[in-house]
Amino acid sequence: MAKIIYPLQKDTIVEDDHRALAQWINTNPLPRLTMGPLVKKFEDKWSNWLGVKYSVACNSGSSANLLMYYALLRSGRLKNKKIIVPSAAWVTTVAPAIQLGFEPIMCEADPKTFGLDISHLEKLLKKYRPSTVIMVQVLGVPNDMAQIMKLKNKYKFFLLEDTCAAMGSQYKGRKLGTYGDMTSVSTYFGHQFSTIEGGLVSTNDRQFYDLLLMLRSHGWLSGLDPKTRAGLLKKYKIEDMGTHFIFCEPGFNFRLTDLQAFIGLRQLEKMDWLVENRSRNHNLYKNLLSPNFGMQEYDAKSTICSIHFCALAKDKEERKKIIAALDENGIETRPFTSGNQGLHPYWFREYGKFNAPMANRLYDCGFFLPNYPTLSESDIKFICSVITKTALKNRS
């Protein structure tokens, strides 16, 4: 491969952030670096930006997904452990269902959004009557949320919303991450904004929030407000000895650090700029590539803040040629990250292969293109010219 000129992603933590972090670390008295007051400040600022009541920061988007599943399981509110999972997803959207003993049922990908196929989803809802559906807002492009919320009201399921790659996107003016009973985001390198590693779970449900706080930190009472803490001590008939070393849940240690929260707070200051530039880039890719390639579709009233742009080649062979041409020109790419989750060993070893037309097409034909805030219009035009010339040459 040629030297990478156009990486798939660039860090949103820039020189000014490094300098500010160095200055903060060396303040007198020296600041606490493990989880402390800055994490809470970061959680509150994110909740305010997103428009939700509560957020719990953790060490990764994958942990955020696991916490959502586990809080739901520990809540005692499930009528069964059946859950519909998406075929077009990252592995840690689906894996907690297996890890925690749910009964996952896979759903076909939608030809327009690459999210949940609405027709197949309703068939599965009718047949299995699951307690839960988890969805992914794939690469920042919203699912058909109007239809999904209608189905939620009709079939009374809990909705977990994975927006790990969709921070800043909107469906007809409403931010993604505000539809689910719980929603997850990832603040890993290359995502809309970064805390080095990290994630958050957001919710408007107080019971879920209290469970998330406990499950993130060993299952203990530390972090709960005094009234909730007192209620749990009374419920379990435990004397309050002024210690938080009382464990009400079998939890994890998924905590974020104040060091990461310091960076996150700075990142949120430029969130609107990050969203605006990624959205501009996504729309330009769409306009330039739509005549010749398959891609996600979305309503004109929606805002798309993607971490990559995904295009679909005609077939496997064309994708190979396009990837080779991109490599030769220093443009980093990859196949649609994992495509159809139902074709990976962790899934088919347990449940058999999930073969569905659209999910398989993503697996065979999808490829990613760079998107980051400093990518210019001329950069995108060059990238698109490489792809288009390669494809049209081989189609003639």
Name each model feature, range by range.
Residues 56, 84, 105, 159-160, ...:
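Structural detector of well-ordered beta-strand residues that form the stable sheet scaffold
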Residues 10-11, 40-44, 52-55, 61-62, ...:
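PLP-dependent aminotransferase class I/II
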Residues 73-154, 158-163, 170:
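PLP-dependent aminotransferase-like
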Residues 1-32, 157, 246-248, 370:
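N-terminal "arm"/small-domain region of PLP-dependent enzymes with the aminotransferase-like
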Residues 129, 156, 180-181, 293:
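Residue-level detector of structured alpha->beta connecting loops
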Residues 161-195, 210, 244-246:
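Conserved active-site segment immediately N-terminal to the catalytic lysine
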Residues 25, 47, 97, 151-152, ...:
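A generic structural signal for well-ordered alpha-helical segments
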Residues 32, 40-82, 96-98, 106-108:
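Phosphate-binding glycine-rich loop
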